[in-house]
């Protein structure tokens, strides 16, 4: 029996499937390992290459196996699927992972540290609470609309409705309706308080990260966007050959439908990290709204773009540019400089 050189590891909650091969590709190990005996099993092996799909708990196992001396590579599940043969089961999945991790063109995911994952938990919890607050706001608006009470859009309008609910002297709201609406209003206020706490924690994390502070200097990037970029990409910035590769990974480049030497570009791919894409486009929209009010003297490129393209198309193009600038600042260790400063230099 040959020495194990490469292992494909299909992870799950309780039982993990191992598929190991030697230098000739011959199968040496094909077995299931319980979670409790996982580290003991890999501790008994000589250091080897271990492939894992980038799914829940993958970063945890990646850190644990690297601590044992193994070389761990995480891969997007969609890229591994091409190597799956016949029926899908744990054994076949592990074999596909083992095959995929050895491919020279395979793209890998950087293993995140616990600190990065903690920051991402703040972002995901924030997303959840924002959605819940929006649901409560819509419910309050819908219920009061049935009573003929409406208000303006946005949080200011919701605040007006909350004031009506709190006013016991407003006879437009029946007592029974006021009782149930008061429950929703208290939940709305509680969510606002929790969101404030999460935002303070994000700001503290942002201030503790020198890279995150440098990213904040880019117009369109604030503490939320900066911390999301640093936490999501981590040490993987140099895995992108250029800023365009980063923008493509986020999904901010046109979709190609080219054949026969003829290039045809469509709308953006919307592949990759949806959350980062949403944040960058939102930041770009803020820059455009500011430019619409105060002019584009410092950014003539943006002025020309806004003149010939719809606002949302311009926002996506600007988001692409922001992503490229972020890559250059992190990879080259630079700081953001305004276009006017660059021209004078």
Question: Model-predicted segments: where are they?
Answer:
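A detector of single, family-specific signature residues
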Residues: 1-345
């Amino acid at each position: 029996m040959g020495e194990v050189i490469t292992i494909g590891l299909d992870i799950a909650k309780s039982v993990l499937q191992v598929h190991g091969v030697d230098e000739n590709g011959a199968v040496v190990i094909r077995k299931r390992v319980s979670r409790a005996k996982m580290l003991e099993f890999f501790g008994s092996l000589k250091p080897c290459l271990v492939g894992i799909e980038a799914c829940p708990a993958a970063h945890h196992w990646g850190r644990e196996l690297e601590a044992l001396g193994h070389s761990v590579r995480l891969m997007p599940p969609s890229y591994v699927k091409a190597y799956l043969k016949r029926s899908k089961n744990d054994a076949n999945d592990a074999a596909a992972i083992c095959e995929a991790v050895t491919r020279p063109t395979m793209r890998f995911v950087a293993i995140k540290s616990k600190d990065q994952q903690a920051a991402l938990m703040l972002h995901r919890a924030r997303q959840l609470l924002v959605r819940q607050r929006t649901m409560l706001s819509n419910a309050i608006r819908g219920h009061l609309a049935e009573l003929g009470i409406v208000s303006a859009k946005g949080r200011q309008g919701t605040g007006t409705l909350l004031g009506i609910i709190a006013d016991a002297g407003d006879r437009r709201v029946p007592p029974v309706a006021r009782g149930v609406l008061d429950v929703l209003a208290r939940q709305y206020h509680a969510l606002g308080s929790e969101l404030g706490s999460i935002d303070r924690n994000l700001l503290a994390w942002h201030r503790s990260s020198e890279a995150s502070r440098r990213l904040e200097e880019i117009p369109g990037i604030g503490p939320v966007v900066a911390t999301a970029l640093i936490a999501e990409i981590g040490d993987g910035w140099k895995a992108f050959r250029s800023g365009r590769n980063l923008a493509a990974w986020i999904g901010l480049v046109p979709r190609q439908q080219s054949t026969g030497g003829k290039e045809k570009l469509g709308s953006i791919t919307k592949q990759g990290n949806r959350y980062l894409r949403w944040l960058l486009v939102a930041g770009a929209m803020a820059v455009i709204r500011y430019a619409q009010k105060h002019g584009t003297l410092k950014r003539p490129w943006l002025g020309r773009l806004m003149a010939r393209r719809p606002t949302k198309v311009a926002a996506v193009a600007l988001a692409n540019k922001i992503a490229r600038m972020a890559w250059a600042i992190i990879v080259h260790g630079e700081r953001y400089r305004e276009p006017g400063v660059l021209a004078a230099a």
